[in-house]
Amino acid sequence: MCTTVTVLTDTWSRREKRFEGHAKILAIGTATPANWVDQTTYPDFYFRITNSQHLLDHKEKFRRICNKSKIRKRHMILTEELLKKNPNLCTYNDASLNTRQDILVSEVPKLGKEAAMKAIKEWGRPISEITHLVFCTTSGVDMPGADFQLTKLLGLNSSVKRLMMYQQGCNAGAAMLRLAKDVAENNKGARVLVVCSEVMLSVFRGPSLQQEDNLLAQCLFGDGSAALIVGTDPRPGLETPLFELISAAQTIIPNTDSHLKLHVREMGLTFHCSKAVPTFITQNVEDCLVKAFEPYGISDWNSIFWVLHPGGNAIVDGVEETLGLAPEKLRASRDVLSGYGNLTSACVLFILDEVRKKSKKDE
């Protein structure tokens, strides 16, 4: 692989490369594995497949967590056959990183391809017109990365400009929108393929009496991929803009870094989430909104449409109550959480797709 960077004067750059208007989402595609689990029966499956049926109190606690999650089902590549073939995935702390990596490095790009093909089909333009690829996943760090593998799977031009983002978790979905906006608006004529592909095999493991937040991870996450085509200046009659990306911002809430952590270990990706996370979000969400929307004169949070990442039901409930949102404002977020679980980076793009579908129905 060869990367070449040409540096021009600022005057030339402004004349030749700048956009004519804000970036727009021109197509959306989503995909999930065919295999899925029913949340009501999942505790029985989970404790059986991990040989943990003797942990009766722990199993009942897990059942309560699942019942409160407001999740109906989740799609997963994990099947009973795969888990029986790889028993080291079913313990809590056996060394299993190699096993997980072998599966993830293959499955993440393949699932991403499914969503990308749907987005490209909706876009309706030749795949050769894609100029940039930005890809993110929480799992399966490898080199060449999932972006390179997807380039081959799709048959993209060898000159396509790629950016790979690993292990940014739920934050990555919105971050990808920001990156795609920046790329599209600073490269005249660019058509950016955005792909978020998540296979949460990395956090699957058996129960631990000492690490109770592990049960939350086993209850919450699902597999899925989402893809967008983003560009400026849609060609009339050839491209149909769905959403316009006006601005993007990111804020760090002070003193919160110890409350939500994922670490790569020999046992896979460990998950640690304190009970304070929903409170931190609800206490700070309005300040973030004020900073983002004040330049546009928007202060009525019910006057805008919402694509809230549903990190969990408590977060959705807390934001709705804190901001006084009407129930329908977060309906798309609740529907995606219910039907798919937390899809980490792909989640907000699934919700964006739900919002667009509902908008079409209401026309």
Swiss-Prot record:
The keyword Chaperone is assigned to this record? no
Q: Which residues of this protein are catalytic?
A: C170
According to its UniProt record, the EC number is 2.3.1.74
- State which residue ranges cross the membrane: none
Acyltransferase: present as a keyword of the record?
Answer: yes
Q: In which pathway does it act?
A: Secondary metabolite biosynthesis; flavonoid biosynthesis
Family designation: Belongs to the thiolase-like superfamily. Chalcone/stilbene synthases family.
| Protein name according to UniProt | Chalcone synthase B
Q: Which organism is it from?
A: Ipomoea cordatotriloba
